[in-house]
Amino acid sequence: MKHFFINFFLSIFFILPKWALKVLTLRKEITYKNEVFDYQSMIYISLISWFITKFGLALDMADFSNDMRLKMSNFRMKINNNHLPKKTINKEDRIIDKKNNLILRQYSLDSQMSDKAVLFFHGGGYAISNIDVYNPVASLMCEGLDTNIFSLEYSLSPENKFPKALEEANIAFDWLINHGYSKEQIIICGDSAGAHLAASLLHDLKARDEDLPFLQVLIYPMVSPSLDFPSLERLGENFLLTKEHMKWFWHYFRAEEANNLDSR
């Protein structure tokens, strides 16, 4: 019932004009460095935060478990996504490390595609989410870019510490090379923690004096465990992802404090 309520509400929310949202919420616009926060996005994030708290799906930093992780992921997958690909997207799970059952999911089209490949890492603070949650994102990328997308189901913290995810990213990159892609054809991409993993992979390749891939695309990346950013002080509360959340993600991602100094 709660999923029906949320989906029904969101179907109405996205057709409301900006003036209607202002009348209904009475929220003021937020400006940061002379840039105005998109009003619809601001209200949407606040509402999603409220829904998550209301239905007991907020990240419990004091008592985190895999059951909570699965509950959060299942909730996200039941929320309707109005932006779905119009073309048929083919999906195939490749086992690229049989010992650890490491999955690399390939998204492709029936029609002729670009010769490039996107190696994609999902977000979630290295602790939550999975390739199933990001299935709509990867599918839309495949259709929009007319390119094969390879989405990695990397190991999550706190069960798996740094550099486990990076090691698996290297395995995925090498798998693409061994299956016909040159480095000039590979694009490394990720969002949030996935963007940090993408950047880490390139730093790791560079440290080993290896040729780098064609391009990296970092979507709102996790950047530094120092969390010393004016934007985080200004926007560190009331926007779903808080400064305390980021402290928690970084803390459980690293194996030891010395990892903060690792260039990867």
Can you annotate each of these PLM segments?
Residues 6-15, 19, 92-264:
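Alpha/beta-hydrolase superfamily serine-hydrolase fold, recognizing
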Residues 1-109, 259:
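A glycine/proline-hinged amphipathic helix-loop "lid/cap" segment
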